[in-house]
Amino acid sequence: MFAVAAVTQSTDDPLSGLHVGDIDEPPVPEDWVSIDVVTCALNHHDLWSLKGVGLPGDRLPMILGCDAAGQAPDGAEVLVYPVISSPGFQGDVTNDPRRSLLSEVYPGTLAERVRVPAGNLVPKPEGLSWEQAACLPTAWLTAYRMLFTNAAVHPGDTVLVQGAGGGVATAAIQLAEAAGLRVWATSRDAAKRDLAKDLGATETFESGARLPDRVDAVMETVGAATWSHSVNSLRPGGTIVISGATSGDAPAKAELTKIFFKQLRVIGSTMGTRDELARLARFVADKGIEPQIDSVLPLAQARTGFERMAAGDVGGKIVFRV
């Protein structure tokens, strides 16, 4: 089976461990189904796996990828929900301490076929293209839960999105604008600030710039580099929702005094539930949102996509056609 896999790991040269080509096809576990992948997409999670983060070396080789859309055995067009719960777990799977993402314990989506529990399939709305559908299961689902479940923002509220340009950030901008929120975004890069405006941001600012007003919520994925700015940008009683720390997880100042004095809420957010993915897909289709796609490549050119992501030269999702 043709697939993209991690065969070795390196923090200094992660792409040295990337294999693009044929690999032995894994068996289908009992009560799981095999999906013929039509499109799949890249996430920073895949780069971290190549660096040895979240993927122990004894599980190599491991097919990478968390995002996919394809056809079920009955011909249905589906999105793949990539969170695998532990046996017998009940409730919100994002709170399952033994949960995993595809490509951590079980083979991922960057392949001709992917195996998942039958309950992990979500119908693909007719209004979504295959390329758009592949964008949703990881970055877009993360942004959806951040905004609508954890920040609990309402039309007319002001949301600050830190680090415009990445997959979660671009998704948050597009989703927030479609929901009637006022969206402000930051980036060090002028081109990415322009992209944020094109996607629906009302205003854009250089990273760390003083804002004209306090905001109701901050969508934080950058971490250490923007943490103090996020805290200082909130109105009293406002909310920071954090789902990543690409610049590091140890800010120079924790800002604890400001957090308790201003009664700020700091909420961690990881992925989302299958039901949230279904609602997200319906919302995107109903609102006519076109997820920002940086590029579409054949899966055989996956290395090019990985190289661009590693260089930070990305504005939106990188999608692969199988």
Stretches found by the model and what they are:
Residues 210-218:
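A short acidic, Gly/Pro-enriched loop at the edge of an enzyme's catalytic core
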Residues 179, 225-292, 321-322:
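Glycine-rich phosphate-binding loop and adjacent beta-alpha segment
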